[in-house]
Amino acid sequence: SSSHEADHGHDAHATEQHAEATHDTHADHDAHADAGHDAHGEDAHGDAHDHAVQDDYPGEAHAAMIESALTHDAHAEYDAHAEHEAHQIANRPWSALYVAAIFFLGLGLGQLFFLGIQYVAQAGWSAGLLRVMEAQAFAIVIPLIFILVISFLGFGHIHHMFHWMVEGIDVVGHPNYDPIIAEKTGFLSPLFFSIRAIIYMVGWIWAAKMLRKNSLLSDTGDGVAMWKKNRGVAAAFTVFYAVTSSTSAWDFIMSIDTHWFSTLFGWYTFAGMFVSSFAALILITLYLKGKGHMEWVNENHLHDLGKFMFAFSVFWTYLWFSQFMLIWYADIPEEVTYYMQRFDQYKVPFFVMLVLNFLLPVLAVLSRPAKRVPGTVIMAAFFVLVGHYMDHYVMIMPGTVGDHYGFGLLELGAILFFAGMFIYVVLSSLAKAPLLHKNHPMITESKYFQQ
């Protein structure tokens, strides 16, 4: 019995030791597992932050982290939106100047092109109007300077009218990176843009100056020789303008809405500038005639000017409809956004502009007798000028100020400033030389022009 109890006690002791050893082994294993788990957690934290967050912040803590991240993103998005809104508000004074400058540039540039056409086509009927065209053409200088200065200030981020000028817009990884605009940096780069802008300025002003210079020299010299010189200048200029009329429209206007493009835009802008310049030519000519000057201008000249204004109002409308209809019918997202913004935010000026640029002037001078009545033609010219200012307004303002637009002292002041400069330059040029281009080889034809 004692031996049995001893054996039983020995077995119990052995069992207890085995249990302790087993427990220690399990404890060591658990400790090793915990250490391995911790080490794995540290590695996972270095490799994938989201996985570590799930391990280290389970349940409510993880939800709090997600909510915090979403709140941070919302704040960042709000800050970016607020900054964009602030830029649009700050752009308004610059945009008001820019719209007026572009509009008055068109009044001179359209007549510079028309003046060149008179020499290339050897036109005789318009010889008595050339001095007015020359004066109007030279009025491009002041608005052109303002356009270039405002554009170049965008490179220094003085304003934010041109989205493609934003810092880092073409740098991969930059917060402002835009892959679509980055693809266009070959054309829309500060250096290339500046080179093109200077070429426009030099080429256009050179043509205006040379046509004026040779015209004045003909008053005291050989009129035929000077006329032939001007034919050469005009031929070179019309080819130059055929290219730059489109590229300048892309640079100065279409690049404001950098993502959007239209292959008709150059023609569309040219048509608007051209018809506006005829409206200005009509008003200046009738003003001078009303003051007792230019007695050689008769109702036939007025009729022809009215026909040009009528014809290019229809041409402008054709281009407007072609551009709008093709974009609307295709319904491509990157194209329709241009018109969606104007429908949503600029609906009133958008549709009023169509009425002023097409319906009213066409109805006013549709008949032959109406084109010969000064009062009717003046009214139609007024519609055209107001309408095409609104056209430029609708082209430029949505991309620069968004829905922070209006017509107040800024816009009115810009119009009055450039109108004053335009009138001053034109009347000063007219006062410096005889209104009649007396040695022009076709001046007699112009004096007795009939149709």
Describe the function of each predicted region.
Residues F104, G108, Q136, I140-P143, ...:
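Hydrophobic alpha-helical transmembrane segments of polytopic
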Residues L115-A135, I150-M165, K209-N230, F252-F261, ...:
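Juxtamembrane membrane-water interface segments of multi-pass membrane proteins
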Residues A33, A39, A44, A48-V53, ...:
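Long, contiguous internal "core" modules enriched in hydrophobic/ aromatic residues
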Residues G108-F113, I145-F146, A197-K209, A271-L286, ...:
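Hydrophobic cores of alpha-helical transmembrane segments in multi-pass inner/ER membrane proteins
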Residues T263-T269, E334-L354, G402-V426:
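Membrane-interface transmembrane-helix boundary segments in multi-pass integral membrane proteins
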Residues S2-D11, A101-D219:
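Transmembrane-helix bundle segments that line or gate the permeation/cavity pathway
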Residues S1-I89, H159-G186, R212-N230, H293-N300, ...:
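Extramembrane terminal tails and long inter-domain/linker segments of multi-pass membrane proteins
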Residues V243-T247, F382-Y393:
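Aromatic-anchored segments of alpha-helical transmembrane domains
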